């Protein structure tokens, strides 16, 4: 988005939500960190201008306006990082809202009106697109676990059919467990060597048991991130779900539980 904004306006800029992930931003005070810039040997003059996500960064250049068929002078706003934008779209703004994204990876995005740092160094402290802050946990394998299990192992793309034998009453009552660390793990373990596995398999275990275990394993990995935040006094008033995994009724129930 920052490159697109540059081509539209000629302004070299970014927003706070995206800049938070660069390790060069003083997230609390919303400015470039002189300490980090000095360590990296980077002059602040070379850094992009910083804007809130809703702030106009400039207007369309004559060239961009002509190519787009729009009038010159149209304002262009900074925009937001992917997870921050998704959170805003799901209503996770203000304080104490949680948006869970189940895509290839999974994120737990908890909004806050004040800046706070995770004392266990397991969650990110970032600026939010609404002008506030948020804690974020990210698991590396979420819906990708289900895709791997269905397409690569079971050789099917009929996800709904495979989940039909799994009723809501069976959730949490399965004796087969799954660790979803197919690509190592980010939050809250920060362990690139972590690996996935099925645990508790018996002679009478079924493919439905294993399918359920995959869904539950991802749900519990998300819960790990939520519990880290709650253990530090972060209150969550409501939560929403987005991403491809949100299409699964079982994951919806698992998230709510």
Regions picked out by a protein language model, each given a short descriptive name:
Residues 40-52:
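A conserved helix-loop-beta module that forms one wall/lid of the active-site cleft
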């Amino acid at each position: 988005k920052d490159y697109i904004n540059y081509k539209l306006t000629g302004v070299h800029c970014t927003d706070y939500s995206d800049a938070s992930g660069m390790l060069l931003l003083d997230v609390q005070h919303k400015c470039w960190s002189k300490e980090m810039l000095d360590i990296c040997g980077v002059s602040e003059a070379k850094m992009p201008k910083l804007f809130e996500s809703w702030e106009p960064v400039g207007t369309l250049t004559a060239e961009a306006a002509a190519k787009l068929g729009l009038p010159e002078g149209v304002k262009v706003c900074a925009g937001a990082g992917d997870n921050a934008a998704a959170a805003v779209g799901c209503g996770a703004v203000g304080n104490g809202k949680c948006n869970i994204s189940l895509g290839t990876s999974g994120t737990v995005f908890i909004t806050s009106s004040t800046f706070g740092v995770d004392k266990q160094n397991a969650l990110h402290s970032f600026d939010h697109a609404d002008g506030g802050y948020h804690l974020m946990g990210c698991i590396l394998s979420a819906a990708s676990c289900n895709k791997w299990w269905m397409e690569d192992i079971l050789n099917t793309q009929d996800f709904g059919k495979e989940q039909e034998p799994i009723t809501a009453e069976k959730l949490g009552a399965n004796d087969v467990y799954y660790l979803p660390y197919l690509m190592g793990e980010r939050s809250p373990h920060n362990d690139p060597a972590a690996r996935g596995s099925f645990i508790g398999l018996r002679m009478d275990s079924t493919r439905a048991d294993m399918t359920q275990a995959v869904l539950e394993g991802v749900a519990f990995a998300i819960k790990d991130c939520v519990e880290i935040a709650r253990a530090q006094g972060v209150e969550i008033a409501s939560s929403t779900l987005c991403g491809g995994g949100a299409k699964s009724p079982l994951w919806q129930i698992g998230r709510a539980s």
